[in-house]
Design a protein with these regions (language model features):
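Segments that shape or occlude catalytic/ligand-binding pockets
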Residues: 54
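Extracytoplasmic cell-surface/polysaccharide-interacting catalytic and binding patches
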Residues: 1-51, 61-154, 162-175
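Conserved metal-phosphate-binding beta-hairpin within the catalytic cores
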Residues: 159
Length: 175
């Protein structure tokens, strides 16, 4: 997602990165999420948009949103960043057998209330999301939760492997 300028920053943030990386603990859990999805829908697969993120990239993201209404969607690097900066968070969705992402109501990286998971029934009721899109989000959360990940309330695509406190105690920040 950040290897192209088609993201909320409008910039390429990863020049030569072609693969996503996670801390092994999170990667093993993600394998379990993929297995859970395959048990339910054998033709579906998880698709990763972002995973481990160096603090240098976090600073670039923060500089785009600081002082705007979008600041709440990006972890402040001056406060230790977020779990992406430990390799313990993943931005993810589900794709079908043709490699097409399932509709989720918004694109990944869409920083607005429509991306929040806290009132999806209201979004359906107000015509901002279809029931199919809501069910797709629920499926994603189900398989990720089963594997031990926690959803971020403001971004349907973002899942944390552990809490920030655990990350600070047990893992190393990526500079």
């Amino acid at each position: 997602m950040y290897t192209q300028a088609d993201n909320f920053t409008g910039e390429v943030l990863y020049d030569n990165l072609t693969e996503a990386y996670l801390h092994p603990d999170a990667a093993y859990a993600l394998i379990e999420a993929q297995k859970a999805l395959k048990r339910l829908y054998p033709s579906y697969s998880l698709i990763i948009y972002d995973a481990a993120r160096p603090m240098s990239v976090q600073k670039k993201m923060w500089n785009v949103v600081k002082g705007t209404s979008k600041y709440k969607y990006v972890s402040n690097p001056n406060r230790g960043g977020g779990l992406h900066n430990y390799g313990l968070a993943v931005d993810i969705s589900i794709q079908d057998s043709l490699g097409q992402p399932l509709p989720m109501g918004t694109k990944v990286d869409h920083l607005s209330m429509e991306a929040h998971i806290t009132d999806e029934i209201g979004l359906v009721h107000n015509g901002k999301m279809s029931e199919t899109e809501r069910q797709n989000r629920l499926l994603l959360r189900k398989v990720m939760k089963e594997a031990g990940f926690r959803a971020l309330p403001s971004e349907w695509w973002h899942f944390n492997f552990c809490s920030r406190d655990v990350a600070k105690q047990k893992y190393k920040l990526i500079p």
